Curated annotation (Swiss-Prot):
Pathway as given in its UniProt record: Glycan biosynthesis; starch biosynthesis
GO CC annotations, alphabetized: amyloplast; chloroplast; chloroplast stroma; plastid
Name assigned to this protein: 1,4-alpha-glucan-branching enzyme 3, chloroplastic/amyloplastic
Alphabetical GO biological process terms: carbohydrate metabolic process; glycogen biosynthetic process; post-embryonic development; starch biosynthetic process
Matches recorded under InterPro entries: A-amylase/branching_C, Branching_enzy, Glyco_hydro_13_cat_dom, Glyco_hydro_b, Glycoside_hydrolase_SF, Ig-like_fold
Length: 899
């Protein structure tokens, strides 16, 4: 018979039979003599507490060094010496390690911690039932109400005590399937069903007794099952050996019993002449001097251990008896049918509450004054969506097309996932982008919030379609080679109570901070309590959910400043590192971001995370091991703000080239990880205007001066996009419609506009001809430049010519040379621009071409330029180029001349 003496821990996940095993072996002292019999010494004495703590501290610092962990590593690398901020990073690192220890006290590993959706919410269990679980520590009673039980708060309630409510506030409710009329209950109490396949092994007709007999026959060797069949034989024999054949039968007769070591020595003395085969294979001596044994440090005979690992496990009887879907449907009526409506019922100290479950995956918002409800989404195997395509490989550079599904159609209505899949995805592919970023996908009560006041974090918005519709969107995008990113909002949540998380269980501090700290200073939204382990469990599981369930490829974390600082980012900064470690910094929020990035990148190595932080917190894109937050990219928010300021407030001839360059390449240390954009949804949606609306919105080409205004607008629109695209990092973003100069802003239906949809759409018809067709052609050429030439992945730009007087900027990136003339009137026949390599340079993009809406002033004889041996701009050679006003040119070194 085999013996298992390693400590084993099992973690069971719902709806599967995956068993996670963790073993720890700690041997204090072992001595193996040459003879067969082993003598093993087990030290169980406890060492003084101070010595243990000292040793633990030393081992932690040693393990950090061995793992290459340095809490201030990026400060050292950048040569930043700030004692206060460095101390803040060290303390944050220590607090993060303590947080991980707390996590491991309640969760098996990080995968378990990030997979709360496998347990929480509503799930079909294999044993013909539905399990529901949710968190409500402030409630005294929990139940599920829905159309399947007549909305009764007593029909399906949590059981009393720990069977229905644990110490952490989680409620567990079982909804048993109902036997059909004339059907008998299952013979086996553990009978399982396969809800996907029509038939399984249990439908073969083999009885449970036969399966158990087969399991025993295959597992036990002859004679090994003797003590299983006669379980009292061993203790009776031991009792007889210890106390003799006429052993006492009562405690009074037993008298005093010598200690274990004395009895063992007596027994050995009595059996000293026995053959070795009759003696135990090992001697265990307790040197703990009466102190408790260390149950975690257990040693076994190598022979026993080898035999255990060589032994094949018995056949899993629960799989052998599992029946298929047809048997289940024949015997049972589902407790919660597909499409059922339900809510969570709480009884609190202030009275009863009905809530949409926090982990609900499909939610219908309030309609016509009715309360919102969750929908149980469990389509049949035939109707459920089946994935067709694998995920695309992550490209070296990202060209992201930012979208909002609801306004993606040309009609004045809320568009759907299905319409977006059919109409917008092919356009994105044709336009040359390699990723889409979706905003407003998680469920939100109010459409006019653009999806930034999330109410149900695990549910795709039902106003766009079903969960399977969203799966189809992601799958078709992958089929076109497009990555799919979500604009995720974990920096705050909607303040709605009936459908959101606010006052979820009746208490004011369930998911959010209590009092003023729990409310955004300006937006009225609720602020998460990131220091709470259960809130972290919710948020990190939410990140893992969208990747696991919907196969998304990454996230842009929205408005990090709102969560990192208790003032929500609305404060003046002194450009001092003290701003990032003072009393207004939420260390718990920072640790959440670190933990989220660490877990996501381990669980999903190809995931992309993007940080949107207006304060550019130090270390955003540094590795977690070096004291950073672990993001892959950060958003350069300053560029779009600069362009809007120039267009609105500064005359064309007063634009500063130095300011443009310093803003576009603000942080050279992290320029490679910068995501740039000229305009995103903020310029079009958040009360602003798109560049096209500013530049030529309402301009009549036939009116006096109209053509000049239109030409100016077209030229600047192209130049702004070209210089932003080519001077940034390895990622670029554009909002839907701006690539062709959408002439109108976005305005969602609200009470102020009589709930009009007239501006909540996109004018795709403008692509066919005219100005918008020219602008689209130019933008497509930009994307093709990166697709075919790899512009964005060729290292950082080398900016060598910035002339504020002439309003000319020039820089190189690999073998490519970019030249911009922003002057509103001055053209230059032979403008000297420095180049390092002598040779021939061919123009590969000219913003003045007629097909891009230009004037066609630059003719073909200007397309090939030969360098002149003349030192300019710190370069050894130069080009003499023809630069019309408000034009841009891109050259490629096609032939190198060696002298």
């Amino acid at each position: 018979m085999v013996s298992l003496s390693n400590q084993t821990r099992f973690s069971f996940h719902p709806n599967n039979l995956v068993v996670s095993e963790k073993r720890r072996l700690g041997i204090s002292g072992v001595n193996f003599p040459r003879k067969i019999k082993l003598k093993i010494t087990c030290f169980a004495a406890e060492r003084p507490r101070q010595e243990k703590q000292k040793k633990k501290s030393q081992s932690q610092s040693t393990s950090d060094a061995e793992a290459g962990v340095d809490p201030v590593g990026f400060l050292t690398r950048l040569g930043i010496a700030d004692r206060i901020f460095a101390q803040f990073l060290r303390e944050r690192h220590k607090a993060l390690k303590d947080l991980k220890d707390e996590i491991f006290k309640r969760h098996f590993d990080f995968r378990d911690f990030a997979s709360g959706f496998e347990l929480l919410g509503m799930h079909r269990h294999m044993e013909h039932r539905v399990d529901f679980m949710d968190w409500g520590p402030g409630s005294r009673y929990g139940a599920i109400i829905g159309d399947f039980n007549g909305w009764s708060p007593t029909e399906n309630a949590a059981r009393e005590g720990l069977f229905g409510h644990d110490d952490y506030g989680y409620w567990f409710i079982i909804l048993e399937d109902k036997l059909r009329e004339g059907e008998e209950p299952d013979e086996l109490y553990f009978q399982q069903y396969n809800y996907v396949d029509d038939y399984d092994k249990g439908d073969s007709g083999v009885s449970a007794e036969e399966i158990f007999q087969k399991a025993n026959d295959e597992y036990w060797e002859p004679g090994e099952d003797r003590f299983i069949k006669n379980r009292f034989e061993v203790p009776a024999k031991l009792y007889e050996q210890m106390f003799g054949p006429n052993s006492p039968q009562t405690l009074e007769e037993l008298g005093d019993i010598p200690d274990a070591e004395t009895r063992y020595k007596q027994w050995k003395e009595e059996h000293k002449d026995d053959p070795p085969s009759n003696l135990p294979p090992c001697d265990i001596i307790d040197k703990g001097q009466g102190k408790p044994y260390d149950i975690f440090n257990v040693v076994t005979s190598p022979e026993w251990t080898k035999k255990f690992y060589e032994k094949e496990p018995p056949i899993p009887y629960w799989l052998e008896t599992r029946k298929g879907r047809k048997a289940w449907l024949q015997k049972y009526i589902p407790a919660v049918p597909h499409g059922s409506k339900y809510r969570l019922y709480f009884n609190t100290p202030d009275g009863p509450l009905e809530r949409v479950p926090a982990w609900a995956t499909y939610v219908q918002p309030e309609d016509e004054g009715k309360q919102a409800y969750a929908i149980h989404w469990e389509p049949s195997p035939e109707a459920a969506y089946k994935w067709k395509y694998s995920k695309p490989k992550v490209p070296e550079s990202l060209r992201i097309y930012e979208c909002h599904v609801g306004i993606s159609g040309s009609e004045p209505k809320v568009s759907t996932f299905e319409e977006f899949t059919k109409k917008v995805l092919p356009h994105v592919k044709r336009a040359g982008y390699n990723a889409i970023q979706l905003i407003g996908v998680p469920e939100h009560k109010d459409y006019f919030t653009v999806g930034y006041r999330v109410t149900n974090f695990f549910a795709a918005s039902s106003r766009y379609g079903t969960p399977d519709d969203f799966k189809r969107l992601v799958d078709e995008a992958h089929g076109l080679g497009l990555l799919v990113f979500l604009d995720i909002v974990h920096s705050y949540a909607a303040a709605d109570q009936m459908v959101g998380l606010s006052l979820f269980d009746g208490s004011n501090d369930c998911y959010f901070h209590y009092g003023k700290r729990g409310h955004h200073k300006h937006w009225g939204t609720r602020m998460f309590k990131y220091g709470d382990l259960d809130v972290l469990h919710f948020l990190i599981s939410n990140l893992n959910w969208w990747i696991t369930e919907y196969q998304v490829d990454g996230y842009q974390f929205h408005s990090l400043a709102s969560m990192i600082y208790t003032h929500n980012g609305f404060a003046s900064f002194n450009n001092d590192l003290d701003d990032y470690c003072n009393q207004y910094v939420d260390r718990d929020a920072l640790m959440y971001l670190i933990l989220a990035n660490e877990i996501l990148h381990v669980q999903h190595p190809n995931i992309i995370t993007i940080a949107e932080d207006a304060t550019y917190y130090p270390g955003l894109c540094e590795p977690v091991s070096q004291g950073g937050l672990g993001f892959d990219y950060y958003v350069n928010l300053s560029a779009s703000e600069m362009w809007v300021s120039l267009l609105d407030n500064v005359p064309d001839n007063e634009w500063s080239m130095s300011k443009i360059v310093s803003t576009l390449v603000a942080n050279k240390e992290y320029a490679d990880k910068m995501l740039s954009y000229a305009e995103n949804h903020n310029q079009s949606i958040s009360g602003g205007r798109s560049f096209a609306e500013i530049l030529f919105g309402g301009v009549d080409n036939g009116s006096p001066g109209g053509k000049e205004l239109l030409d100016r607008g077209i030229s600047l629109h192209k130049m702004i996009r070209l210089i932003t695209f080519t001077s940034g990092g390895r990622a670029y973003l554009n909002f839907m419609g701006n690539e062709f100069g959408h002439p109108e802003r976005v305005e969602f239906p609200t009470q102020s506009n009589n709930f009009s949809f007239s501006l909540a759409n996109r004018r795709w018809d403008l692509l066919e001809s005219g100005v918008h067709h020219h602008l689209f052609s130019f933008d497509k050429e930009l994307m093709d430049l990166d697709k075919s030439k790899g512009i964005l992945s060729r290292g950082l730009p080398s900016i060598h010519h910035v002339n504020d007087a002439n309003m000319v900027i020039s820089f190189s990136r690999g073998p490519f040379l970019f030249i911009f003339n922003f002057h509103p009137s001055n053209s230059y026949e032979k403008y000297d621009v420095g180049v390092e390599e002598a040779g021939e340079y061919t123009m590969i993009l000219n913003s003045d071409e007629v097909k891009y809406g230009g004037q066609g002033i630059v003719t073909e004889d200007h397309y090939l330029q030969r360098s002149i041996s003349k030192r300019i701009d710190g370069q050894r050679n130069c080009l003499e180029v023809f630069l019309p006003s408000r034009t841009a040119q891109v050259y490629k070194l096609t032939r190198i001349l060696r002298i």
